[in-house]
Amino acid sequence: RPIYKINGLKSLNKKINSLFGNLMIGLEYIFKRTGPMTMGASQLCMFAKSDPSLELPDLQWHIQPMSMDTLGATKNHDFHAFTPTVSNIKPTSRGHVSIVDKDSRTYAKIKQNYLSTDNDRMIAAKGLKLTRKIIMESETFKKYSPEEYRPGININDDEELVKEASNYAQTIFHPVGT
């Protein structure tokens, strides 16, 4: 989940982090039926190919107007930023779910096994590089002076990018395998 700081445009981070901001979000919804409570987490979706020779896209982005270190576990950042989450929609890695014992109350063992194939690791690196290129080089984003917060502009090597991807890999919105 890469994160980009932005200037000249407000994200939801600061509003969500304050009691007053949350109150205003709630009141806007109650009285106007507009605002952040009327929308899904992702405001934009995009598809692309990690390799131009592919017949169909293998990457999907969900772009959220907010950022945090760990989804659902930490507060939003105290700066304005957005999160362009990139997913491999044709993964070759396979996880599994196993029954642990006969007791139905015992949680199953889940091995997610993200990024366990060379192909998936290569696509993860390509996805992060393409995200960076779109945000840092396109005219659309230049007026917001984006700064790469994560993985960090100094991380360029494919293996380093894969390591960063594995640090934040998670399932989102069922892009594949549901």
Predicted regions and their residues:
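FAD-dependent oxidoreductase catalytic-site/capping-region signature
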Residues: 6, 10, 16-178
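Catalytic cores of eukaryotic secretory-pathway lumenal/extracellular enzymes that build
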Residues: 1-3
